[in-house]
Amino acid sequence: MELTTRTMATAKNIALIAHDHCKTSLLAWSKKHKSLLKKHHLYATGTTGNLIQNETGLSVTNMLSGPMGGDQQIGSLISEGKIDVLIFFWDPLNSVPHDPDVKALLRLATVWNIPVATNLASADFIVSSPLFSESVDIQVPDYQHYLNGRLK
């Protein structure tokens, strides 16, 4: 696959998602890092986003609840280059009805080369990185090149 460069701005577009058993952890993490997060643009699935917004006062653009299509909405934003970082506290010990959506979301984050945190430690590493508050170039698939090759 041919690659091209996409520049992430200093203010990142961050998606926040948590499965039910992980919402408390993501909420506590959001409170702990509120001063950092307020410098960025936050997106979240419905329940998670409303909890974070109500408990922290942070501005959050809320999608639908995960099982109702919110994971897919976030995935679409990733594919469009509109999400720079995915913080996704998922529960590896419990299956959810929308497991295929979860797998698709993680696949898209990998395809489009965005940083992904799936637990407290990895989320802390991401926000403590000097790159978190800088403009950063990343390599992403060159979709136009891909499409042109498919249409020949």
From Swiss-Prot:
Originating organism: Photorhabdus laumondii subsp. laumondii (strain DSM 15139 / CIP 105565 / TT01) (Photorhabdus luminescens subsp. laumondii)
InterPro entries (alphabetical): Methylgl_synth, Methylglyoxal_synth_AS, MGS-like_dom, MGS-like_dom_sf
GO BP of this protein: methylglyoxal biosynthetic process
Cited PANTHER family: METHYLGLYOXAL SYNTHASE
Stated name of the protein: Methylglyoxal synthase
Family according to the record: Belongs to the methylglyoxal synthase family.
EC number: 4.2.3.3
HAMAP family in UniProt: Methylglyoxal_synth
Gene Ontology CC annotations of this record: cytosol
Reactions catalysed: dihydroxyacetone phosphate = methylglyoxal + phosphate
Pfam families given in the database record: MGS
